[in-house]
Each structure stands twice: as structure tokens, then as C-alpha cells.
Design a protein with these regions (language model features):
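Conserved short histidine dyad/triad with adjacent acidic residue
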Residues: 31, 44-60
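Structural motif
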Residues: 72-74, 81, 97, 107
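Ligand-binding loop in jelly-roll beta-barrel domains
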Residues: 94-115
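Histidine-centered metal-chelating micro-motifs
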Residues: 53-55, 90, 94-99
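Glycine- and acidic-residue-biased ligand/ion/polar-headgroup-sensing regions
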Residues: 61-73, 78
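A cytosolic small-molecule/anion-sensing beta-strand core signal
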Residues: 69-70, 85-86, 104
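Short acidic-glycine-tyrosine-enriched beta hairpin
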Residues: 79-94
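A short, N-terminal "cap"/entry segment at the start of jelly-roll beta-barrel domains
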Residues: 1-40, 55
Length: 115
């Protein structure tokens, strides 16, 4: 394999839970830009608990991709609200205000990509 190529292989059970930057829920960071040398902020397996809320916020330079693996959330983006359940995908462009209200314990894959 060429020296400039990076292969990263992990099982999620080997990755410690850490608090989210919003102070709600917990996540296991699967990969970061530093590790893979690509313009991702992070790829994380995120767990949010029923009743939690990720307050309205904005990422000026980061697009977010959410893939819901279980549970239920209401995600408000600017003036629209989306009910998200298992197997749903949601893209939030950089610069959009968004908030997550957790209806049922939710497991999701979150991918942040710098613009």
C-alpha cells in the first residue's frame, strides 16, 4: 500500500464514549480529519436519550449528515421540522440553524464535513 494511503479499522466497542460538543447525549468518534487526512470534522456513533434536546445552533463551515439507526427525533432546520426514525438520512447544510428534540432513545451516525 502506498505510504500516503491510510486504512482505519475499528469496532465501536473499542471506542470510548465522549460527551458531545453540545453537552447532550454521548458519542463514539469513529474517525477524525487528523486520522484519515480528509476534510471531515468527524464521523461519530451518537446516542441521544428520550427527552434530551440539542438546542438551536449553527455550524457556519460544516455540513452535517445524520443517518438514524434507531429511535425517533424531531429535527428543526430553519423553518422546517423533520420527524426522523430508523433508516432515515438527513443532510443539514452549513449555515442552517438546527435543533434536535429526542422523542425516543436514538442511535445515529453523524458525519461532519468542512466546506
Amino acid at each position: 500500500m502506498p505510504k500516503d494511503k491510510v486504512v482505519l479499522h475499528r469496532h465501536s466497542a473499542q471506542i470510548e464514549f465522549v460527551p458531545t460538543s453540545h453537552g447532550v447525549g454521548e458519542k463514539r468518534i469513529i474517525a477524525t480529519q487528523t486520522e484519515v487526512g480528509k476534510p471531515i470534522t468527524q464521523i461519530a456513533r451518537t446516542l441521544l436519550r428520550a427527552g434530551e434536546q440539542v438546542a438551536m445552533h449553527i455550524h457556519p463551515t460544516m455540513d452535517e449528515h445524520f443517518f438514524f439507526m434507531g429511535g425517533e427525533c424531531r429535527v428543526s432546520i430553519d423553518n422546517s421540522t423533520y420527524n426522523c426514525v430508523a433508516d432515515d438520512y438527513l443532510f443539514i447544510p452549513a449555515g442552517c440553524n438546527h435543533q434536535i428534540d429526542v422523542v425516543k432513545d436514538t442511535l445515529m451516525l453523524t458525519i461532519g464535513i468542512e466546506k
